[in-house]
Curated annotation (Swiss-Prot):
Keywords: Amino-acid biosynthesis, Cytoplasm, NADP, Oxidoreductase, Proline biosynthesis. This is Gamma-glutamyl phosphate reductase. One of its GO terms (biological process) is L-proline biosynthetic process. Pathway: Amino-acid biosynthesis; L-proline biosynthesis; L-glutamate 5-semialdehyde from L-glutamate: step 2/2. Belongs to the gamma-glutamyl phosphate reductase family. The gene is proA. It is an enzyme of class 1 (oxidoreductase). GO terms for cellular component: cytoplasm. InterPro entries: Ald_DH/histidinol_DH, Ald_DH_C, Ald_DH_N, Aldehyde_DH_dom, G-glutamylP_reductase_CS, Glu-5-SA_DH, GPR_dom. Its EC number is 1.2.1.41.
Length: 425
């Protein structure tokens, strides 16, 4: 048995124990995990500093450094997030259907854990803690395979969380961190369909494509966020600028940050100069089509690749469109089914925008930054699914469970042949 198969088998065995834990036991475990992060803060931050030094040596971009970096405030927020997850309602055991059929059988649909979830991700060490906590809260085992750029941070975080499992007299193999960064090890992991029930890739386009193409396990992709804001002709200009600043500048490296601004031609002469002036203090680089460059001479001319880009940086692509249909067509062509925003005072246009786009989250007169599990009332999220399966959009605890039927009867049979069978003649 290979090493990675052995680890997955151990996680599978541990997951059976997690699936039987009471809500109170899981709450205490997650609170202990949060305390372990606080206790190991110095060790975790030192490991993260080493990761950051290595990343700077390799001259990675500012967006990657931001996703990788931890500080005392971010680490404290990670621990607080675990306490918040501990306090969330437990989805396991929830009855989603309760029915009695005419023949007397009692039918229920009940949420149960998925089993073992593999999380493959890049850069963000907070995902190590968040994903582990969410999966364990939902009664699942978790196999984590982070990126090489965060390996020291991830080991330090996982070590703290595994110690909490031991303190709770639970197998630490309920949480596995794969430390072998070789591509062939990840490839082997993706073949273990008999031991792993779901794989969630979260990272760059190359990683997600690799996982989707090679996995023999069901995959829920957390694809790139090419998010748009369309400013309709009837839009309130002040509102549109406020949403634009929030969506682009507050955390440009987030997957729910705006990447492209679409503007109706009727409002463009009034809106775009004001929007450009509002964005200037934040250092946002603007790239626009020819019509935009006519209104804003300092703007760089956008290429086709700009409209498909997830910048994760202070760069914004702009296009002026003649109508709502043109905006929808642009989003269908370049979007990633993540999050789209319309700013409009026309209810019919808002309804058309919502109905015509397949994106996981559609906002009407609200910031793209609300495309987040906490902001949408899920309490926490493991990511934002762009795969149209049972989980689409921000994935909370419910998305880490499945529903199964439990049927209780008093000896009912569907067909009733003679019993014992009549003797053959």
């Amino acid at each position: 048995m290979s090493h990675i198969r052995h680890l997955a088998q151990q996680c599978r065995d541990a997951a059976r124990i997690l699936a039987t834990l009471s809500t109170d036991a899981k709450r205490r475990l997650l609170e202990t995990m949060a305390t372990a992060l606080n206790t190991d803060a110095a060790t975790i931050l030192a490991a993260n500093a080493a990761d950051l030094d290595a990343a700077r040596t390799q001259q990675v971009g500012t967006a990657m450094l931001d996703r990788l970096a931890l500080d005392p405030q971010r680490l404290a927020a990670m621990a607080d997030a675990l306490r918040d997850i501990a306090a969330l309602p437990d989805p396991v055991g929830q009855v989603t259907r309760d029915d009695r059929r005419p023949n007397g059988i009692h039918i229920q649909k009940i949420r149960v854990p998925l089993g073992v979830i593999a999380m493959i991700y890049e850069a963000r060490p907070n995902v190590t803690a968040d994903a582990a906590a969410l999966c364990i809260k939902a009664g699942n085992g978790i196999i984590l395979r982070g990126g090489s750029e965060a390996i020291r941070s991830n080991i330090a975080i996982a070590t703290a969380l595994q110690r909490a499992l031991r303190l709770a007299s639970l197998p630490e193999t309920a949480l596995i961190l794969v430390q072998d960064m070789a591509r062939h090890t990840m490839l082997e992991l993706l073949q273990l369909s008999d031991l792993i029930d779901l794989v969630i890739p979260r990272g760059g386009e190359g990683l997600i494509r690799f996982v989707a193409e090679h996995a023999r396990i069901p995959v829920i992709k957390h694809y790139k966020g090419v998010c748009h804001q369309f400013v309709d002709a009837s839009a309130d200009i002040e509102m549109a600028i406020r949403l634009l600043i929030d969506g682009k500048t507050t955390r440009p490296a987030a997957c729910n940050a705006l990447e492209t601004l679409l503007v109706h031609t009727d409002i463009a002469p009034r809106f775009l100069p004001a929007a450009a002036a509002a964005l200037r203090p934040y250092g946002v680089q603007l790239r626009g089509d020819h019509a935009t460059c006519t209104l804003l001479p300092d703007v760089l001319l956008a290429t086709d690749a700009d409209y498909a880009a997830e910048y994760l940086d202070l760069i914004l692509a702009i296009r002026i469109v003649p109508n709502l249909d043109a905006a929808l067509e642009h989003i269908r062509r370049y979007g990633s089914d993540h999050t789209e925003v319309i700013v409009t005072a026309d209810p019919a246009h808002a309804d058309t925008f919502v109905q015509q786009l397949p994106s996981a989250v559609v906002m009407v007169n609200a910031s793209s930054r609300f495309s987040d599990g906490g902001a949408l009332g899920l309490g926490a999220e493991i990511g934002i699914s762009t795969t149209r399966l049972h989980a689409y959009g921000p994935m909370g605890l419910d998305a880490l469970t499945v529903e199964r039927f439990v049927v209780r009867g008093q000896g009912q049979v569907r067909h009733c042949p003679p019993y014992p069978p009549a003797p053959r003649r």
